[in-house]
């Protein structure tokens, strides 16, 4: 039985970070590696990453003639996946189709379609393997759907084989994150121990948090050829004890890697010693949800941090020469003066990289229902739910002006001459040209929004 695991390209309307980063489809690699031994010789599995694949989707279907196709994606891919499943059914009438990924696990009903046979809303690896076994046993679609719907609740343990990175060997040199290239992914924990009101990640595990055994993580790290490693935990910087074990094992095994991680500002502010030790074993950059400089916003988001904590965090990372990728949420009550104050604050702290996200109450989060009446876009306009489009009506300026202020803030923070020279010195001219080209494409998407006014 021939099986294709497909990551689709984003919609052209989606304001895409794929212009400055393309990461490996780790979830599909896990599916590939965890096919049960008793059926492994009965299935031919290929991962097709259409973000970097040169063939057109229709040509892939004609050449491969799959029996089963499984798609992965975010909310922005829902419409695309529906259309791709319809195309597959028309070209290959016998093919079975499925959809998975983080959005399917939280809002599975979005994938309801006559062209999608199976939706994996929990325990994707087990559900995928169950589907394979039943398809090999000639079960019909309704029988498989019934079996999937009666599957156990979401698991809070992780005992799977390491991802099959060889399944994307033809694409690996194309995977990068900003200046981290080529870059591999690893996940050491699942869920988040905090409960920020805007966060989609915690909904995936229904608010639960669990971590892998650190020895197993280190064994996986040793098998990864890339030097640049992006640890994609929702919050890697959480437990001092666990991080100490990570530091000790990295040192004992003499692992030479460069790490990019997610971390909270309060942990960094309170644990400068641990951050320094992580720097010594390869920590290069941290993505930090600064979220806001306004106290009221931080309380509304249930962030449990303060402006002062954020400032201390930034200063610690700067002192240790650890790159900061700061993310901030821009509320819709922002005024022109608020944009100016935020820009000045970021510039005064010498923040070099920032991701400014208009407040986006994603379907599936606890804040979504509170904002339904204020939506500018349809719930079903999936491609614009990218945390870059303005989906709520700004209170004190036009949509066009809001986009203009966003773009202006980006340029005022990022495109400072002293930052550009420092980045060239640190990463080289070629890497900076690549980033400039990618960021210019994102800027053009914003410019089109400004011209159109929506």
Regions from the PLM with identified roles:
Residues 2-224:
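Acidic, low-complexity intrinsically disordered segments
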Residues 10-14, 107, 194, 241, ...:
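Flexible glycine/acidic-rich beta-alpha junction loops that bind and position SAM and/or redox cofactors
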Residues 56-57, 64-66, 247-250, 336-352, ...:
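Short, electropositive alpha-helical surface patch
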Residues 96-98, 120, 260, 287, ...:
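Structural detector of well-ordered beta-strand residues that form the stable sheet scaffold
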Residues 110-129, 275-286, 343-356:
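Structural recognition of alpha->loop->beta junctions
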Residues 167-328, 332, 341-344:
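Radical SAM [4Fe-4S] cluster-binding motif and immediate context
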